[in-house]
Regions:
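Short glycine/serine/threonine-rich phosphate/pyrophosphate-binding segments
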Residues: 1-10, 34-35, 79-80, 93-107, ...
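A glycine- and small-aliphatic-rich helix-loop capping segment at beta-alpha/alpha-beta transitions
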Residues: 8-17, 41-46, 108-118, 134-138
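Glycine-rich oxoanion-binding loops at beta->alpha junctions
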Residues: 36-94, 134-148
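Short, ordered loop/turn segments at secondary-structure junctions
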Residues: 27-32, 62-63, 99-102, 114, ...
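Residues at the starts of beta-strands that form the adenosine-phosphate
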Residues: 21-24, 92, 115
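N-terminal phosphate-binding or glycine-rich loops at protein starts, especially the Walker A/P-loop
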Residues: 1-38
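Accessory alpha-helical/coil subdomains and C-terminal extensions
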Residues: 85, 96-98, 104-108, 115-116, ...
């Protein structure tokens, strides 16, 4: 799947290039974890068995880019908190996976002097500079498999089913899911 496969690939690459002495710190729930200092020391065995597992072993959260410079209800300046925790953890680099907002925040942190490697991850496949994002094709594959199964049930029972999939306004994912199995039957 998308996130776990990418996390595993990053970890395996680090271990292969730098040896098992490399320290990998997983940040729980993405930027929220970096803001509030919620982390987990990772070991090589943490990355075994996750290649085909959906979701993410580290969790995720929504931290809207437009609110990154807004002090929250606990008087926390999110950008300053992330910079402080980055330094406190002694990170050499922050690897982030995500869509447009994640990429904007990664660039903001880079502008603040942090070393950031940003990887494109969104089922919408709408990020500038890349043809395919992590997660797009796996999401399409899963949705089209479900559509195939439901189609056979609808046909055998003489019924019509409406299938809704998650996507952003550009809807590349929706179009791809609907087009592949039955190009004349998608709206």
């Amino acid at each position: 799947q998308g996130l776990n496969a990418t996390i595993r690939a990053v970890a395996k690459t680090l271990y292969n290039q730098l040896g098992n002495d490399v320290e990998i710190i997983g940040i729980i729930d993405g930027y929220r974890g970096l803001i509030y200092g919620e982390t987990r020391k990772m070991k090589p065995e943490n990355f075994s068995g996750i290649l085909t597992m959906g979701g993410t072993i580290l969790g995720t959260s929504r931290q809207p880019f437009k609110l990154m410079r807004v002090v929250d209800e606990n008087s926390v300046d999110k950008v300053e908190a992330m910079k402080k925790n980055y330094k406190k953890l002694g990170l050499d680099c922050l690897v982030v996976l995500g869509g447009n907002g994640t990429q904007k925040t990664a660039n903001l942190l880079r502008e603040e002097g942090l070393n950031v490697v940003s990887l494109p991850k969104t089922i919408d496949n709408d990020l500038w500079g890349t043809d395919k994002t992590f997660g797009f094709q796996s999401a399409v594959d899963i949705a089209t498999n479900v559509i195939d199964c439901i189609h056979s049930t609808a046909t055998s029972h003489g019924r019509v089913f409406i299938i809704e999939v998650m996507a952003h306004t550009l809807c590349r994912y929706c179009r791809r899911c609907g087009y592949y199995p039955y190009p004349r039957n998608s709206v």
